[in-house]
């Protein structure tokens, strides 16, 4: 019974999320987040937004604004 209720709630949640994120047929990009909408208008913008990343061997962490280019940080970029 509990599993059935959990499955029912999960299906309702997924259905609601599909309707919330679905495109509007008149304005296809109206419901998308701001960053994604900008990337759809200018596809090269997503490539240009990869700024200020630290290369391998540079110091990284919570105090530094820029993240590692590869995404792996353990006090230094790996």
UniProtKB/Swiss-Prot annotation:
It comes from the Eukaryota. The presence of a 'disulfide through disulfide knot' structurally defines this protein as a knottin. The modification Pyrrolidone carboxylic acid is found at residue 52. It is found in: Secreted. GO terms for molecular function: ion channel inhibitor activity; toxin activity. The keyword Cytoplasm does not apply. Belongs to the conotoxin O1 superfamily. This is Conotoxin 1. Keywords: Cleavage on pair of basic residues, Disulfide bond, Knottin, Pyrrolidone carboxylic acid, Secreted, Signal, Toxin. It comes from Conus imperialis (Imperial cone). Its main location: secreted. Disulfide bonds join 53-69, 60-73, 68-77. Residues 1-22 form the signal peptide. Expressed by the venom duct. Residues 23-51 form a propeptide. GO terms for cellular component: extracellular region. The lineage of its organism: Eukaryota, Metazoa, Spiralia, Lophotrochozoa, Mollusca.
